[in-house]
Curated annotation (Swiss-Prot):
EC number, as in UniProt: 3.6.1.-
Name of protein: Small ribosomal subunit biogenesis GTPase RsgA
GO molecular function ontology, one term from the record: GTP binding
Gene Ontology annotations for the cellular component aspect, listed alphabetically: cytoplasm
Length: 297
């Protein structure tokens, strides 16, 4: 048996397709992974053994930098948050959920706004507002419908593993098809009853694009903060981190404490009210969630 190091590019029906040295190997996971309740993920760097391209075994998963649950991908560098301006309507709350989740996983976010061409002039003011708020925080915001927008996005891909996420029905599959027409991914219809897109993507696969790898992923429109402790939340807001050194209390949660610099900057208009209100809502969600009890093994 030959021992090799590679990366899982696709997982399907119990098989893991591992890319190594220009070849793709079909492998299975050894039974001891199941016994240890470890599941190999797309994006994992692995050690595996194989004598041919169809009968390999994954032996070891190398340490992960991060992992996402939805979609199940490991070692992600860049998260493109695709947000629709209309149908479904734009939501500051949802965008901030995605950004907080990415910051927590140490994944660089890029904000991509779709359906900008459907807006009238008053609605376009919101695009300007979004750009002002988030570019000031250091986030890239792409907001146009032409070839230039996809070109702007492509410059982020080289040497990175990129995941697309965002509102269901916001146009993630459409966007990926524009970037790489050979993908021919199914695009979502908007559900009349929910006002949200129906999920069209079924399994995750890493596709080599522009000297990087891109995962096509389901478009979930709700994110919860199951893993995060309340004290971690303020650290995921860059503007809070910058202000916190001037708060009266070192572990200030920017809620009820006196002498809070974050609250002062919100009142002064330096920190966006929408960001602070969303922070308070997320904080309440974390504090009110039921404890997760792990079963004894």
């Amino acid at each position: 048996m030959v021992y090799l190091k590679g990366q899982i590019r696709k997982a399907l029906s119990g098989f893991y397709y591992v890319y190594a040295d220009g070849e793709t190997y079909q492998t299975r996971a050894r039974g001891n992974f199941r016994n240890r309740k470890i599941t190999p993920l797309v994006g994992d760097e692995v050690l595996f053994e194989s004598d041919n391209l169809t009968d390999g075994y994954v032996l070891e998963i190398l340490p992960r930098r991060n992992e996402l649950v939805r979609p199940p991908v490991a070692n992600v560098d860049l998260g493109v948050v695709v947000m629709s301006m209309v149908s479904p309507n734009f939501s500051f709350n949802l965008l901030d959920r995605f950004l907080v989740s990415l910051e927590y996983k140490d994944i660089e976010p890029v904000i991509y706004l779709t359906k900008v061409d459907l807006l009238d002039e008053p609605q376009r003011q919101q695009v300007t507002e979004i750009k002002q708020i988030y570019e000031a925080l250091g986030y890239a915001v792409i907001a146009s419908e032409d070839v230039e927008a996809t070109k702007e996005l492509e410059r982020f891909f080289p040497e990175r593993l990129t995941v697309f996420m965002g509102q269901s029905g916001a146009g993630k599959s459409t966007l990926l098809n524009q970037i790489s027409p050979e993908l021919q991914l199914a695009t979502a219809e908007i559900s009349q009853s929910l006002g949200r897109g129906k999920h069209t993507t079924r399994h995750v696969e890493l596709i080599p694009l522009y000297d990087g790898l891109v995962a096509d992923t389901p478009g979930f429109s709700a994110i919860d903060f199951l893993e995060m402790e309340a004290v971690e939340l303020p650290k995921q807001f860059p503007e809070f981190v910058a202000a916190a050194s001037h708060c009266k209390f070192r572990e200030c949660m920017h809620h009820k404490e006196p002498g809070c610099e974050v609250k002062r900057q919100v009142e002064a208009g330096t920190i966006a009210t929408s960001r602070y209100e969303n922070y308070l809502q997320f904080l309440m969600e974390i504090e009110n969630r039921r404890p997760v009890y792990k079963k004894k093994s």
